[in-house]
Amino acid sequence: MSTCGPCGSLFSPASFRENCLPFLKELFASVTLPHHLHICGQTQRHLSLLKETGAQAISIDACVDLAAAGRIFSPETVTLGNIESAGVLLRGSPAEVARAATVMMDSMAGIADYIPATSCGIPRATPAANIDAFLDVVRSR
């Protein structure tokens, strides 16, 4: 199960704590299926609050420092992310995707409970060669 929304960009941390966190805690406490949380946009100021949701994993958008998120989430919560799906993955060359994936993977060295992933959904027009380049880097690690 996945839940997604833009509330990280729309709410201040105080407003997120008051309006979103109680609902997300209740939701994730009641779910027995594997699940993760993805909040689109800039959630850097919300990282510790996201961990408090109780989600098994948290997916980070490309505009957020992935390594900083991993240091906050690990080892209790899995970090997912965050190659830029609407940027380099969609518009870059396979070589550019491979470089970005390598930088992403290097930034997470030493952080437990990490799953390399895209920053958001993969756009339909993403070249298959770019997806392959991303997966090749991930598999080589």
Tell where the protein language model's regions lie, with residue ranges.
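Active-site loop segments of alpha/beta catalytic cores
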Residues: M1-R141
